[in-house]
Amino acid sequence: MMKIVFMGTPEFAVPSLERLIKEFGVKAVFTQPDRPKGRGKKLSISPIKEVALRENIKILQPQKLRDDREAIEFLKKLSPDFIIVVAYGQILSKEILDIPKYGCINLHASLLPKYRGAAPINWAIINGEKFSGNTTMFMDVGLDTGDMLLKDEFKIEDNTTAGELHNKLMESGGELLVKTINGLVEDSIEPEKQKDEESCYASMLDKKMAKINWNLESEDIKNLIKGLNPWPLAYTYYKGTMMKIYEAEIIDKKEDFSPGFIIDVSKGGIKVATKDGILLLKKIQFPSKKPMYVEEYIRGNKIEKGIILE
């Protein structure tokens, strides 16, 4: 009987845990401690804890696993075949990495060695990559630097947002983990070292990077809009008021206007000049209003052409 311990926290990790429960069973789940959330600061449990409670699996929530002797001794006593890690949010010490028979396996949402780090899905889209995917790897003490095991690859379609790619990779990750576990048990996978010279780092997102620079090319602005949807959302200022942008498309036409200039407003959207052409803003949101397509917004509100977005 296979002994698997799962470590994960957000929604992204849920299908992986559910698939492993179905295929092998899971002996214990590690997830981040409950956190205060919302205005009432009510304690909120992680999506992974919800699954573990539902499935009646033992739950451990150490504040800092690497320093928690009780949790480490629990793992040593259990002596698992695998520790599977999907977006857990804590770094594992060498002492923990050495516990399982076959090793600690991580599912990472990029085609490693590209996009190591916290926000691989977003940066793949912001940088205009044509492909993305999941990679399983042996964990070592570095950040996403371990030997690679298996990959699945997807084409990033032209209008794919970070949210859509997140969901696609989230749903496919569990199957890749099952193949990885079976392959390691059967000794049919040849681990592959990462080439550090081909790596790049996907740093955490912050709201400062979400402000649109209209002096960039249309393609770069469109990629930023897609890559920051659903969070933190790219934005600009219309007459001093923040306008978030959910969706845009490039118009292949060069007009001689200053970047950020609103050329036209119609049901189809807001035409804005960029460094090399025109971007059509299709779905927007103003403070305290819901996101709307421009066609709907201009029925009851005015957006003037001739204004420069800042």
UniProtKB/Swiss-Prot annotation:
GO terms for cellular component: cytosol. Keywords: Protein biosynthesis, Transferase. GO terms for molecular function: methionyl-tRNA formyltransferase activity. It catalyses: L-methionyl-tRNA(fMet) + (6R)-10-formyltetrahydrofolate = N-formyl-L-methionyl-tRNA(fMet) + (6S)-5,6,7,8-tetrahydrofolate + H(+). It is an enzyme of class 2 (transferase). It comes from the Bacteria. (6S)-5,6,7,8-tetrahydrofolate binds at S110, L111, L112, P113. InterPro entries: Fmt, Formyl_trans_C, Formyl_transf_N, Formyl_transf_N_sf, Formyl_transferase-like_C_sf, GART_AS, Met-tRNA-FMT_C, Met-tRNA-FMT_N. Its EC number is 2.1.2.9. Belongs to the Fmt family. Attaches a formyl group to the free amino group of methionyl-tRNA(fMet). The formyl group appears to play a dual role in the initiator identity of N-formylmethionyl-tRNA by promoting its recognition by IF2 and preventing the misappropriation of this tRNA by the elongation apparatus. This is Methionyl-tRNA formyltransferase.
